UniProtKB/Swiss-Prot annotation:
GO terms for cellular component: chloroplast membrane; chloroplast thylakoid membrane. GO terms for molecular function: magnesium-protoporphyrin IX monomethyl ester (oxidative) cyclase activity; metal ion binding. Pathway: Porphyrin-containing compound metabolism; chlorophyll biosynthesis. It is found in: Plastid, Chloroplast membrane. It is a peripheral membrane protein. Keywords: Chlorophyll biosynthesis, Chloroplast, Iron, Membrane, Metal-binding, NADP, Oxidoreductase, Photosynthesis, Plastid, Transit peptide. Residues 1-45 form a transit peptide. This is Magnesium-protoporphyrin IX monomethyl ester [oxidative] cyclase, chloroplastic. It catalyses: Mg-protoporphyrin IX 13-monomethyl ester + 3 NADPH + 3 O2 + 2 H(+) = 3,8-divinyl protochlorophyllide a + 3 NADP(+) + 5 H2O. Belongs to the AcsF family. Its main location: plastid. One of its GO terms (biological process) is photosynthesis. The keyword Disulfide bond does not apply.
Length: 417
């Protein structure tokens, strides 16, 4: 699952908008414990190649260097849903709209496993990591951490859905299980990348300590469809850019993005089929409102998030805002084929609103980094948060584009290039 599942507009902490502190330094983290505030923290364990710790005093136990990393800094969150409702939705005896032939065709796509031998590393990885220094190295580690967490989040959700739907609809259940295979493969590949920087996410600990954000099934469908499709456009855009500009190929993981994005696209096609099988999620006024809401949630989150990390995109030769707008345009056009309404993102006013949100967000971040007392910081944030919310509401109220229908041309699972 791509990092677009970072739906911070739905996150009460709103850490993407500067209310949480910026990312801590990325040092090897060992113990996981509960902070005094009660927030669960998780660990990044040191890899074998980590720098040796200072020698311990004679007779004293050896300690490894550690720096805690707050869970909220490594998004997206982990999602759960109403599995009983899911079972009802995919029960062919209850839901006569299910097109099993369509799901059978998709299942064959997933069984083919086009990328079974794609994610194989070579010595270039470690060599490139050793050459990367300064701010780019730090922010690249954060990119790997966040991406690994996103993929692992998808793995856990898809795995559970595959398990729970096995009796109700074995075909749909198997597709979810095969998607969890893909997500696990992606997460493992990214975690191997962290080992090039002498780090590794402790995924076993994440499995035990994860927190869940509950989404109703229809919200899972909207959000995950967008997550997979926007992930496709992000990956293929970066791949094409670096293929045309190889001097910015700072790390070989990007060379894998062309095949990688095919997984994202197949996952999105499956969620498109799920939505078509539930026309009540697409054919009324509530569906139009929710479709616009989730589109905006994903687009705004990505734009603000990426603008906080421009050094990463500049490091690979991209203009952050131009890259994001291209991804938003393409994702919106793809989404319009299935969602009943989408935002008019090509209206120039939409980008102006996004840029104003970025400016407000930077001010909120600046307050968080100041030396003011916590109470003073909170008081200073209030009017800025109100401005940010106002801009988000104004973007939502812009005239939308009436779009897709469950009756559009017959679905054929295929890749977009």
């Amino acid at each position: 699952m791509a990092s677009a599942m970072e739906l911070s507009l739905l996150n009460p902490a709103m850490h993407h908008y500067g209310i949480a502190a910026k990312t801590a330094s990325h040092l090897p983290v060992v113990p996981a414990r509960r902070a005094s505030s009660g927030a669960v923290r998780f660990r990044v364990r040191a890899a074998a190649a980590a720098p040796p710790a200072p020698a311990a005093k004679p007779g004293s136990p050896k300690k490894r260097g550690k720096t805690e990393v707050n869970e909220s800094l490594l998004t997206p969150r982990f999602y759960t849903t109403d599995f009983d409702e899911m079972e009802q939705l995919f029960n062919a005896e209850i839901n006569k709209q299910l097109n099993q032939d369509e799901f059978d065709a998709l299942l064959q796509e997933f069984k083919t496993d086009y990328n079974q031998t794609h994610f194989i590393r070579n010595p270039e990885f470690k060599e490139a990591a050793d050459k990367m220094q300064g701010p780019l190295r730090q922010i690249f580690v954060e990119f790997l951490e966040r991406s690994c967490t996103a993929e692992f989040s998808g793995f856990l959700l898809y795995k559970e859905l595959g398990r729970r739907l096995k009796k109700t609809n074995p075909v749909v259940a198997e597709i979810f299980s095969l998607m969890s295979r893909d997500e696990a493969r992606h997460a493992g590949f990214l975690n191997k990348g962290l080992s090039d920087f002498n780090l590794a996410l402790d995924l076993g600990f994440l499995t035990k300590a994860r927190k869940y954000t509950f989404f109703k099934p229809k919200f899972i469908f909207y959000a995950t469809y967008l997550s997979e499709k926007i992930g496709y456009w992000r990956y293929i855009t970066i791949f094409r850019h670096l293929k045309a500009n190889p001097e910015y190929q700072v790390y070989p993981i990007f060379k894998y993005f062309e095949n990688w994005c095919q997984d994202e696209n197949r996952h999105g096609d499956f969620f498109s089929a799920l939505l078509k099988a539930q026309p009540q999620f697409l054919n009324d006024w509530k569906a139009k409102l929710w479709s616009r809401f989730f589109c905006l949630s994903v687009y705004i989150t990505m734009y603000l998030n990426d603008c906080q990390r421009s050094a990463f995109y500049e490091g690979i030769g991209l203009n952050t805002k131009e890259f994001d707008m291209h991804v938003i345009y393409e994702t919106n056009r793809t989404t319009a084929r299935i969602f009943p309404a989408v935002p008019d993102v090509e209206n120039p006013e939409f980008k102006r609103k996004l840029d104003r949100m970025v400016d407000i967000n930077l001010k909120i971040i600046s307050i968080g980094e100041s030396n003011d007392l916590p109470l003073v910081k909170n008081l200073k944030r209030v009017p800025l948060i109100a401005q940010l919310v106002s801009e988000i509401i104004a973007a939502y109220l812009m005239p939308p584009i009436e779009s897709g229908s469950v009756d559009f041309a017959e679905f054929e699972p295929k890749l977009v290039y």
